[in-house]
Amino acid sequence: MTRLQRLFRIAWVFCRYRLDTFLPLSELPTPLKIFFLLAPWHLFPQPKLSRGDRLRLALEELGPVFVKFGQILSTRRDLLPDDMAESLKQLQDRVPPFPSEQARGIIEKSLGAPVSELFAEFSPDPMASASVAQVHAATLPNGQKVVVKVLRPGIEKVIRQDLGLMYLMAGLLEKYWSEGKRLHPVEVVADYDSTIHDELDLQREAANASQLRRNFENSPLIYIPFIDWDYTRKSVLVMERIHGIPIADVPALEKAGVNMRVLAEKGVEIFFTQVFRDSFFHADMHPGNIFVDVSNPADPKYIAIDFGIVGTLAPDDQSYLARNLLAFFRRDYRQVAQLHIQSGWVPPETRVNEFEAAIRTVCEPIFERPLKDISFGHFLLRLFQTARRFNMEVQPQLVLLQKTLLNVEGLGRQLYPDLDLWSTAQPFLEDWMRKRIGPSGLIKSLQNHLPSWLEQSPEMPQLVHDALLQIRSSGPTEAQNRATLALMKEQQLRSERRWRRGFIALVLAGAALVGSQPHAGQWLADLPVWSWALLAGAAGVMLRGSR
């Protein structure tokens, strides 16, 4: 299908479901007004469905690329009204499987050998089929039971074509719709572009799975299947076959005698462990991707699959998020506002008092509920919606995190309705903050950064000299040069004094921490030579800088 044919197909579906009623025709420029007035809307009576259901059915009819886009939009309640977001949550990826002969051809081309040589057994009937790939059961020559994920043929071309049209429509909305500049539709499509292209590379998914498996090796919380890298390529992924009960099958879990409270609390612990310990989290934890190992019903274990979408948080984002959540539950709305400004999530010129008042208006009603009924995910959602009114830039990593948290909460309360997320999460957050900003955190930071500082310190005089020469040659008057040089020297001296004081404070904190340990003397004697060398080098830099 050509791009023009596809565009007409999209327009036809829009007409069929009367999506014209969503558009602010009065705000459109004259050419677009004429187009919409001449379009054959009158041939289609308005369906007796809610606007959310009409949008959902239209996206399903347009195919897998639009379905996936709708699924992502369902988590963006800062962009869509609640009723439409709820309807989009029901979107189903209804894609028929492609013939097994095609799957075999892709496997043989990718792995360079016949399927009969690669596998002792290969099921021609797919276990599951989705928009991007389908999965077959197989057995390796060594007897290992595996699943083989095969990329759908031609999917890259389909995605490229539909994304081009999405960018076109988003660009028109951003240019001609009054809300377009605030909601950044082009940015939304760009985020989706990045997400869906990540899913097209099965080697990337395999790498994500390997990282998560390493992070949770021997963990009692969750099991990640191993990847067979000898059989994995960009279009083919071979992974250990797992056995468990789907987490959404609550009757089966109850019949197996699973402790539902423990299972729900483990889900919360898994989420916070990924976000704050590892800064690497499975960002597609919907019920279809989670199973439960019930071999020990009193202490059940999660099993995760489908690692195409993962999220990461920078250390600063981790810190601001943890401090935001802790400040929220202390009802310290001023700190919440200040943290948003300090993090750069909202512009620095934002008025703290106004922002604090807006946050209070949103958050106070939440505290009228029992703690067990407070939703972290909806808190973040309402907070981001409020921040958008103050020109908060879209933070893709936080959008992924909020979506994942909503999934985790939904699962947890489906399993155990009285789940109190705060009592489960608070100790984790407070412990993480103590480790990050306490003496041990300072010493760890010093250990990580001191070698780099020592390596760069010999270059500092030359850098300062070069900067001064550049100022001298830039053309100001001699008096201006002298004033600038004097100011720079004073700033340099102040910086050196602060650096020395900070270093001394770190050493004293480290000494206090070491001194509090049993057998401190023996511990110091056992320190490796390189540790003493680093400390001696740092002291030398201090003495040299103090002259």
Curated annotation (Swiss-Prot):
Q: Where are the transmembrane segments?
A: 502-522, 523-543
Query: Under which pathway is this protein filed?
Result: Cofactor biosynthesis; ubiquinone biosynthesis [regulation]
Q: What is its EC number?
A: 2.7.-.-
- Please name the CDD domains in this protein's record: UbiB (cd13972)
| Principal location listed in the UniProt entry | membrane
User: In Gene Ontology terms, what is one molecular function of this protein?
Assistant: ATP binding
- What SUPFAM superfamilies does its record include? Protein kinase-like (PK-like) (SSF56112)
Residues that bind ATP: 127-135, 149
**Where in or outside the cell?**
Cell inner membrane
Record's Pfam families? Answer: ABC1
Q: Which InterPro entries match?
A: ABC1_dom, Kinase-like_dom_sf, UbiB, UbiB_bact, UbiB_kinase
Domain of life per record: Bacteria
Q: Where's the active site on this chain?
A: 284
- Domain Protein kinase spans what residues? 121-501
Q: According to Swiss-Prot or TrEMBL, what is its membrane topology? A: Multi-pass membrane protein
Q: What are its GO biological-process terms?
A: regulation of ubiquinone biosynthetic process; ubiquinone biosynthetic process
Q: Which UniProt keywords apply?
A: ATP-binding, Cell inner membrane, Cell membrane, Kinase, Membrane, Nucleotide-binding, Transferase, Transmembrane, Transmembrane helix, Ubiquinone biosynthesis
One Gene Ontology CC term in the entry: plasma membrane
Its family remark reads: Belongs to the ABC1 family. UbiB subfamily.
User: What does the protein in this record do?
Assistant: Is probably a protein kinase regulator of UbiI activity which is involved in aerobic coenzyme Q (ubiquinone) biosynthesis.
Protein name, as recorded:
Probable protein kinase UbiB
Q: What's the gene?
A: ubiB
